[in-house]
Amino acid sequence: MLQPKRTKFRKQMTGHNRGLALRGSKVSFGEFALKAVARGRLTARQIESARRALTRHVKRGGKIWIRVFPDKPVTKKPLEVRMGKGKGSVEYWVAQIQPGKVLYEIEGVSEELAREAFALAAAKLPLATSFVKRTVM
């Protein structure tokens, strides 16, 4: 699963996930893309699960790009532990997603197959998504 090899600090503050995606909102690599319409957090497991659904559906055809990376640690205290005594240990990693962010891209397959594959992948994600095509100016 995806997670940073090393970070400057082990734990991060929760923070806020406001605004729209300023970067990573255009289809850069592939022909078709899955774009987030809602805001939220994607865990490394969810990103991997959707990637597997994509690769299994397109089989050997096409190339897939993952445009998000889980770089934020989420901590959790063990069960039945009283409050206080410091922050919990890192439980999993998340990518914070703003509306407009491109999550996955694909090329080398037909539009129909890409739509089917992205529908399967979107079912694995906790966000509302949309299918977008690359626009060449």
UniProtKB/Swiss-Prot annotation:
<dbReference type="InterPro" id="IPR000114">
    <property type="entry name" value="Ribosomal_uL16_bact-type"/>
</dbReference>
<dbReference type="InterPro" id="IPR036920">
    <property type="entry name" value="Ribosomal_uL16_sf"/>
</dbReference>
<dbReference type="GO" id="GO:0006412">
    <property type="term" value="P:translation"/>
</dbReference>
<keyword id="KW-0699">rRNA-binding</keyword>
<keyword id="KW-0689">Ribosomal protein</keyword>
<keyword id="KW-0694">RNA-binding</keyword>
<comment type="subunit">
    <text>Part of the 50S ribosomal subunit.</text>
</comment>
<dbReference type="GO" id="GO:0019843">
    <property type="term" value="F:rRNA binding"/>
</dbReference>
<keyword id="KW-0687">Ribonucleoprotein</keyword>
<comment type="function">
    <text>Binds 23S rRNA and is also seen to make contacts with the A and possibly P site tRNAs.</text>
</comment>
<dbReference type="InterPro" id="IPR016180">
    <property type="entry name" value="Ribosomal_uL16_dom"/>
</dbReference>
<dbReference type="GO" id="GO:0000049">
    <property type="term" value="F:tRNA binding"/>
</dbReference>
<dbReference type="Pfam" id="PF00252">
    <property type="entry name" value="Ribosomal_L16"/>
</dbReference>
<dbReference type="InterPro" id="IPR047873">
    <property type="entry name" value="Ribosomal_uL16"/>
</dbReference>
<protein>
    <recommendedName>
        <fullName>Large ribosomal subunit protein uL16</fullName>
    </recommendedName>
</protein>
<keyword id="KW-0820">tRNA-binding</keyword>
<dbReference type="GO" id="GO:0003735">
    <property type="term" value="F:structural constituent of ribosome"/>
</dbReference>
<dbReference type="GO" id="GO:0022625">
    <property type="term" value="C:cytosolic large ribosomal subunit"/>
</dbReference>
<dbReference type="InterPro" id="IPR020798">
    <property type="entry name" value="Ribosomal_uL16_CS"/>
</dbReference>
<comment type="similarity">
    <text>Belongs to the universal ribosomal protein uL16 family.</text>
</comment>
